[in-house]
């Protein structure tokens, strides 16, 4: 029942490999399937260098459908999307959600993007952190997303200025709102390969999420086929250590629980 819930395609202009190549690696890792979640098109020119264009959306849907048919009976391939959120994007995102039958809609705030920094960074990094965590909560409150992706990504922007203790107040306020909205949050293993060497989110944030009974979704944010299910074993160990007993997947935009013990047993080593 374990799926890779966060992965990309070359249409985002910074990933390599077709969906079938990701499926092949998923099969080797013992996964039941993958949900392709490439970066969404926008209708206002927001960060066009890291996403498909509106004119490429039909190609994206067809690419995933072709792979689904090719791999049917071996690896279950589903269509998803990772959509950027900032306040004011809601009408377009609502339209986009109706343009295809998505199985998993990730909501993302990318504070390292130039467009985001230009609009929201005032020179005060502490204030920037507050804005970021406020936007995560706002994204959840829209009801447009199943899962909030890589939820402490702001630490990547300026590592020398990131202060977790300072940010915890903003984090907890954000988590209160996300929990009330009933939105899941991602545990993204790509953070283990950064200078921090920790998940997105970090352990203290995971503990606060657990206190609020926020369900978690595991994803590697794979931009290369070889990254499918990367470090899932480590992430499951960390989640168990924190106190989580289940992870979740979304299929047909419905959340399904998987015991961590079951997920761990499903994974194959390569």
Language-model regions, residue ranges each:
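Charged catalytic cores and adjacent phosphate/nucleic-acid-binding surfaces used
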Residues: 1-9, 19, 162-270
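Hydrophobic faces of well-ordered beta-strands that scaffold small-molecule active sites
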Residues: 3-7, 34-36, 77-81, 105-107, ...
């Amino acid at each position: 029942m374990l799926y890779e819930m966060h992965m990309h395609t070359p249409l985002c202009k910074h990933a390599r490999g077709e969906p079938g190549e990701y499926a092949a690696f998923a099969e080797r890792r013992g996964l039941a399937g993958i949900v392709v979640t490439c970066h969404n098109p926008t209708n206002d020119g927001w960060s066009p260098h890291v996403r498909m264009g509106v004119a490429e959306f039909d190609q994206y849907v067809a690419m995933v459908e072709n792979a689904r048919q090719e791999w049917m009976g071996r690896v279950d391939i589903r269509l998803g999307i990772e959509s950027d959120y900032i306040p004011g994007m809601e009408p377009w995102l609502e339209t986009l959600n109706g343009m295809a039958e998505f199985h998993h809609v990730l909501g993302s705030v990318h504070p390292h993007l130039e467009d985001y920094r230009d609009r929201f960074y005032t020179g005060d990094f502490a204030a920037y952190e507050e804005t970021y965590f406020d936007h995560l909560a706002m994204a959840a409150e829209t009801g447009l997303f199943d899962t909030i992706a890589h939820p402490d990504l702001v630490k990547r922007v300026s590592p020398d200025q990131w202060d977790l203790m300072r940010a915890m107040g903003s984090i907890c306020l954000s988590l209160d709102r996300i929990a009330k909205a009933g939105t899941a949050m991602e545990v993204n293993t790509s953070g283990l390969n950064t200078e921090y060497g920790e998940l997105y989110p970090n352990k203290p944030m995971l503990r606060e999420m657990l206190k609020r009974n926020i369900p978690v979704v595991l994803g590697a944010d794979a931009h290369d086929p070889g990254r499918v299910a990367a470090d899932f074993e480590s992430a499951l160990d960390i989640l168990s250590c924190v106190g989580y007993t289940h992870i979740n997947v979304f299929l047909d935009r419905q959340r399904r629980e998987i015991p961590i013990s079951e997920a761990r047993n499903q994974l194959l080593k390569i």
